[in-house]
């Protein structure tokens, strides 16, 4: 995968560059990302997680082939060349089937890998760190690595079978907190030690050799570690470079390896840039993008309520809250406290569990009505200034059309701009 290997090669030669991975399946988030990459002439890495997308449909209802088609059709409609698009699979392994015995869970993981690779995903994160129903807790490095090597062999065979060659790029390892933000309130976070990182690498190298996969080791281009960044519902742990100094030095001894940092959402622009400089050259972002989407929609709903009588309004926020209460499975094990605390978390939490509800038909109908209501007449500038002040500046400067969709996309792109600046050292254009 030339874009990723070129990035790693340049980084290892001393360039403080990187790439960000957009981890979302929301159409407006993906449109924002594709348009931003197109305007700035950069490749775009879009990743699906094993929770979102799997051979059975995941929580999005999409298989890997469905997700590929969805993203590629969107890219085509926006004039973005598919040659600049990189698809990645995140946390691929037995994650979805931890409640099953390891034999069954890994059989499902084999099929998961086949479905991702056959669909043309080229960046494959092998994560077998989770214990299955009959496993010890925690798993040893050796077991984790053996299972990852097994999946790598499946991936290589599938790629050869479907494409006549294998150009897959692999990521191994995992961060300590769960994917997508911590479940509980954060108190302290341990940075991965150099010793633990080396142990993960060596265990995987040995397991790959046992599977006869020595030749693909140079294509293991990233190791997931915990650099000391995380967020929960109301707090952010900011990157502290001094705590990751030894870890950062350790990766310099490997020829074609950088770190991949998960849960970088809500870090400051300065922290994102420093992460890249410290060799955390792949930055994952997801909830921060849907958080920005939610912010923009809540702002537009407030504008709608100022402009229209209640009976004509979309009632987006009311519909959203009602559906979340009727179907609490995506938030009830994450948000705690009294009724008011949970209500606030449902709407405003950094962990953004609301992102699981946007595809709901009732909520989508309310969203479409909101957009229609505000598209009929120009939105008064003072209301844009009140509720979307950053977009107001762009509207006033003639850089942004004040339509509902463009205001939403611009707000999401404000987050993407921070990641672009961190990875490319420059700030270019929203589009």
From Swiss-Prot:
One of its GO terms (cellular component) is plasma membrane. Pathway: Carbohydrate metabolism; D-tagatose 6-phosphate degradation; D-glyceraldehyde 3-phosphate and glycerone phosphate from D-tagatose 6-phosphate: step 2/2. It comes from the Bacteria. SUPFAM superfamilies: Aldolase. Pfam families: GatZ_KbaZ-like. One of its GO terms (biological process) is D-tagatose 6-phosphate catabolic process. Belongs to the GatZ/KbaZ family. KbaZ subfamily. Forms a complex with KbaY. NCBIfam families: agaZ_gatZ, PRK15458.1. Component of the tagatose-1,6-bisphosphate aldolase KbaYZ that is required for full activity and stability of the Y subunit. Could have a chaperone-like function for the proper and stable folding of KbaY. When expressed alone, KbaZ does not show any aldolase activity. This is D-tagatose-1,6-bisphosphate aldolase subunit KbaZ. The lineage of its organism: Bacteria, Pseudomonadati, Pseudomonadota, Gammaproteobacteria, Enterobacterales.
């Amino acid at each position: 995968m030339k874009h990723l290997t070129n990035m790693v090669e340049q980084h290892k030669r001393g360039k403080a560059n990187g790439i960000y991975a957009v981890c979302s399946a929301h159409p407006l988030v993906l449109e924002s990302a594709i348009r931003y990459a197109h305007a700035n002439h950069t490749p775009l890495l879009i990743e699906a997680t094993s929770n979102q997308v799997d051979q059975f449909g995941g929580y999005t209802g999409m298989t890997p082939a469905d997700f590929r088609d969805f993203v590629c059709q969107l890219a085509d409609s926006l004039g973005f060349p598919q040659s600049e698009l990189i698809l990645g699979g995140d946390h691929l392994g037995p994650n979805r089937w931890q409640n099953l015995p390891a034999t069954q869970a890994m059989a499902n993981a084999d099929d998961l890998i086949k479905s991702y690779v056959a669909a043309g995903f080229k960046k494959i994160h092998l994560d077998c760190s989770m214990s299955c129903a009959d496993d010890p807790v925690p798993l040893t490095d050796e077991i984790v690595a053996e299972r990852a090597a097994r999946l790598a062999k499946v991936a290589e065979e599938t790629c050869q079978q479907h494409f006549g060659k294998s150009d897959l790029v692999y990521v191994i390892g995992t961060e300590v907190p769960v994917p997508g933000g911590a479940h509980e309130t954060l108190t302290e976070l341990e940075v991965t030690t150099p010793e633990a990182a080396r142990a993960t690498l060596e265990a995987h190298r040995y397991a790959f050799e046992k599977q006869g996969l020595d030749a693909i080791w140079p294509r293991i281009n990233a190791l997931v570690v915990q650099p000391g960044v995380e967020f929960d519902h109301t707090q952010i742990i900011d990157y502290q470079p001094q705590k990751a100094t030894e870890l950062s030095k350790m990766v310099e001894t490997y020829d074609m390896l950088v770190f991949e940092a998960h849960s970088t959402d809500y870090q400051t622009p300065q922290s994102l840039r420093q992460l890249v400089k410290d060799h955390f050259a792949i930055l994952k972002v997801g909830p921060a993008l849907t958080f920005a989407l939610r912010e923009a929609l809540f702002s537009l709903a407030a504008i709608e309520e100022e402009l229209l009588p209640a009976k004509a309004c979309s009632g987006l926020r009311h519909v959203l809250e009602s559906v979340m209460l009727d179907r609490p499975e995506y938030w009830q094990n994450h948000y705690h406290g009294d009724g008011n605390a949970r209500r606030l978390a449902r709407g405003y939490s950094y962990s953004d569990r609301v992102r699981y509800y946007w595809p709901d038909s009732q909520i989508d109908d309310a969203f479409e009505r909101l957009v229609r209501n505000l598209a009929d007449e120009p939105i008064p500038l003072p209301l844009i200034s009140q509720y979307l002040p950053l977009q107001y500046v762009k509207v006033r400067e003639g850089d942004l059309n004040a339509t509902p969709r463009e205001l939403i996309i611009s707000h999401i792109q404000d987050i993407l701009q921070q990641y672009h600046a961190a990875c490319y050292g420059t700030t270019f254009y929203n589009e």
